[in-house]
Amino acid sequence: MAVADIKTAEIVKDNARSANDTGSPEVQVSLLTARINELTPHFKANAKDHHSRRGLLKMVSRRRRLLDYLKGKDLDRYRALIEKLGLRK
């Protein structure tokens, strides 16, 4: 397995609601957060990389929409996820 696959499997295992869960909002938000955190140093070093920045902004928007959905669906799960990932300080 590649390093990214191992990290992905670990993130899914840590945030899954059941054994085969890969699509719950918690898992999706956690995976997006990991990808966003990996890209952030790239933009500190490459400020003019606007093409990749657009992809980053799309990921941030998708994460925000998933969090909004989860907040409306189950507020307790939303708060637990925000606390776990350290978002919205």
From Swiss-Prot:
Transmembrane portions of the chain: none
Species per Swiss-Prot/TrEMBL record: Polynucleobacter asymbioticus (strain DSM 18221 / CIP 109841 / QLW-P1DMWA-1)
The keyword RNA-binding belongs to this UniProt entry's keyword annotation: yes
Family indicated by similarity: Belongs to the universal ribosomal protein uS15 family.
Quaternary state and interactors: Part of the 30S ribosomal subunit. Forms a bridge to the 50S subunit in the 70S ribosome, contacting the 23S rRNA.
SMART domains, per the entry: Ribosomal_S15
Descriptive protein name: Small ribosomal subunit protein uS15
GO molecular function: rRNA binding; structural constituent of ribosome
GO biological-process terms attached to the record: translation
Key words of the record: Ribonucleoprotein, Ribosomal protein, RNA-binding, rRNA-binding
Gene Ontology, cellular component aspect: cytosolic small ribosomal subunit
